[in-house]
A protein has these predicted regions:
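S-adenosylmethionine/decaboxylated-SAM
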Residues: 2-15, 22, 26-261
Length: 261
């Protein structure tokens, strides 16, 4: 797969999606495909469909794309998103499902496509991205459905994790995992997003990130980056990935980090 080419296509879609995260998604989704991990691709908060198009680029036959966003009820929005998916990927639009509702609705309702078929998402999503309402209430409700949908070896991504304008977002996540300790465990923080998995898969994904993601990013991402790992506590080590210019602001004497690249 030509990652530069597919990301240039993504850049033609209106919206917000950091290039660094685009390549991180490419690595995760490619890894899952190489390891024959089957599962649906889900997004809460679609906007113009920019990141949904990235999911569509990695969809395998039989997998469904599900986008949930109340703004999809606006005139022309669904058509606009579908057109964006069509021009950036080769996916059959029959597998793209767009819903204009709150995630609370789906928590109590099995999703039925416009064709009448029922698609089961419970424990079936291998990749789930949350970028919807940023209030504590909205995020908590999104996490409830994400916990229901995410497969045992799936990846959860949350947007705007490092944006200080949305403190409720981080607070809601920690409130959720304190109440539901077997739900999610943080793997990595980028300059914008947080990446998590099921706790039982944590060591497997951390190992893959340390041994496989670094070579991938060196080969395909054309900007200098730093990846480092917190090491205060062995059982809660996290990876952090950022551009070298941002890393220069980190205190080099900080013994809480272990620079990997």
């Amino acid at each position: 797969m030509d990652f530069k080419d597919i990301n240039e296509k993504i850049d033609t879609v209106e919206g917000f999606f950091q290039p660094l995260d685009q390549y991180i998604w490419d690595w995760i989704l490619t890894l899952q495909n190489e390891e024959n991990l089957f599962g649906h691709l889900v997004e809460f908060g679609v906007y113009k469909g920019k990141s949904l198009c990235k999911l569509a680029q990695h969809q395998k036959v039989g997998e469904h794309i599900l986008g949930v966003d109340c703004s999809l009820s606006l005139e022309g929005m669904k058509t606009s998103v579908m057109n964006a998916v069509k021009k950036t990927s080769n996916i059959s639009l029959a597998y793209v499902n767009l819903l204009d509702c709150m995630t609370e609705y789906l928590y109590t309702t099995r999703y039925t496509s416009e064709g009448g078929a029922t698609t089961e998402f419970r424990n079936k999503a291998r990749f789930l991205h949350i970028d919807a309402g940023h209030s504590g209430y909205n995020v908590y409700e999104d996490l409830k459905l994400a916990d229901r949908y995410l497969s045992p070896n799936g990846i959860l991504v949350m947007d705007d994790w490092t944006t200080r304008f949305y403190p409720d977002l981080v607070d809601a996540f920690y409130r959720y995992i304190i109440t539901n300790p077997n739900s999610f465990k943080i793997l990595m923080i980028s300059e914008c997003k947080m990446y998590a998995c099921r706790p039982k898969e944590y060591s497997n994904y951390i190992w893959r990130m340390e041994t496989k993601m670094i070579p991938f990013m060196k080969e395909h991402y054309n900007k200098p980056i730093k990846i480092f790992k917190t090491k205060n506590y062995v059982d809660s080590a996290k990876l952090v990935i950022m551009h070298e210019s941002e890393y220069s602001k980190v205190d080099p004497q900080d013994n809480a980090i272990d620079v990997l690249v």
